[in-house]
């Protein structure tokens, strides 16, 4: 049974990206995955201070917050999903902060062989205009994977045209997220 960790990074409670996370989770569970869904907005993750103490000592980050727990969960997962709304053509501040703090996950980077990652993003822009937004966010995701060294990109879902919280509920994007979840 594969362990699947889904990290939803929207600061909004009834977020469209959260709906897609739950659809992905349902598909992954039906495929036999053991799924854990975490909302980053509920976690205390401070900004990286750039002190490099984690690199110099090899003992992780000196900041005592929820990032330590999240890095451990990433280490235990076979598959992880990063989900975000698109804000100003990139990932949410919550996801960017998580990515920046992952420098303290050096051990994860050395032991990440065989792990797979998925990316889910939601843009309020209509599909015809959302492509540029998604390209920038996809670049942030792929850059993160490159830093992790040996994590395989398993799938990307870029939803568009969904502005109001919950407006994605009755769209084709839900089925696409569910089907992508079944591929774990």
Region spans (language model):
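Short beta-strand segments
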Residues: 83, 120-121, 158
């Amino acid at each position: 049974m594969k362990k699947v960790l889904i990290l939803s990074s929207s600061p909004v409670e009834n977020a469209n990206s959260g709906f897609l996370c739950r659809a992905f989770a349902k598909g992954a569970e039906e495929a036999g995955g053991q799924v854990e869904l975490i909302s980053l907005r509920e976690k205390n993750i401070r900004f990286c201070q750039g002190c490099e103490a984690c690199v110099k000592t090899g003992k992780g980050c000196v900041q005592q917050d929820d990032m330590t727990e999240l890095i451990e969960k990433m280490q235990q997962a076979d598959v992880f999903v990063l989900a975000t709304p698109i804000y100003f053509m990139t990932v949410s501040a919550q996801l960017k902060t998580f990515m920046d703090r992952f420098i303290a996950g050096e051990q994860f980077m050395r032991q990440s062989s065989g792990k797979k990652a998925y990316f889910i993003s939601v843009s309020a822009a209509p599909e015809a205009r959302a492509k540029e937004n998604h390209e920038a966010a996809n670049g942030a995701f792929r850059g993160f994977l490159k830093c992790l060294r040996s994590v395989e990109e398993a799938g990307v879902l870029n939803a568009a045209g969904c502005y109001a919280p919950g407006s994605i509920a009755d769209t084709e994007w839900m089925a696409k997220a569910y089907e992508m979840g079944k591929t774990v």
